[in-house]
A protein has these predicted regions:
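Short solvent-exposed loop/turn micro-motifs enriched in small/polar/acidic residues
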Residues: 11, 70-71, 101-104
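Hydrophobic/aromatic beta-strand elements that line small-molecule binding cavities or substrate pockets
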Residues: 74-78, 91-93, 105-111
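Short, low-complexity N-terminal intrinsically disordered segments enriched in polar/charged residues
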Residues: 1-30, 34-35, 132-133
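Short beta-strand segments enriched in hydrophobic/aromatic residues
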Residues: 32-33, 90-94, 123-124
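A short hydrophobic beta-strand element
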Residues: 82-92
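A solvent-exposed, acidic/Ser-Thr-rich amphipathic alpha-helical stretch
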Residues: 6, 25-84
Length: 133
């Protein structure tokens, strides 16, 4: 396992994580196109939730920005050009505002347009209770 490579997408990803930890939602949203689509499986019923545009993305990120700590270990990294696309699997450890820690696995995929994230699939692969998606 490891870290993001020193590529354009690797640097964008590192900045993405840095902005989450810094709780800088405006700068985080600036990484996305105005009409971006984020599909998330971070829901209590484990059904997909669709966030379109920056106002809805802001809603999604409010929950993530409430984390006290976030550690990411990349298990899989793949990127391509034309279109610029990223696919990663991450082992994630978080500490929430109550001080409770959780370990999960995510699968994230980005499709970029003009250097910004246009489509983001944020999928939970392994939930905090250890169950698989």
């Amino acid at each position: 396992m490891g870290h993001a490579p020193d590529t354009t997408l690797g640097r964008l990803y590192k900045e993405h994580i840095r902005l989450i930890l810094a709780k800088d939602i405006d700068a985080l949203l600036d990484q996305y196109t105005q009409d971006a689509l984020l599909i998330s499986s971070f829901s209590a019923d484990r059904k997909p939730v669709y966030f379109r545009g920056r106002d809805q993305l802001r809603e999604h990120f409010q929950g993530i920005l409430g984390l006290k700590n976030l550690e990411v270990d990349i298990a899989f990294w793949a990127e391509s050009e034309n279109p610029t696309t990223l696919m990663i699997v991450e082992a994630v450890k978080v500490v929430d505002n109550k001080g409770e820690s959780s370990t999960m696995r995510f699968a994230d995929s980005w499709v970029l347009k003009d250097g910004k994230i246009a489509i983001h699939f944020a999928g939970m692969v392994q939930y905090p209770d250890g169950s698989l998606a």
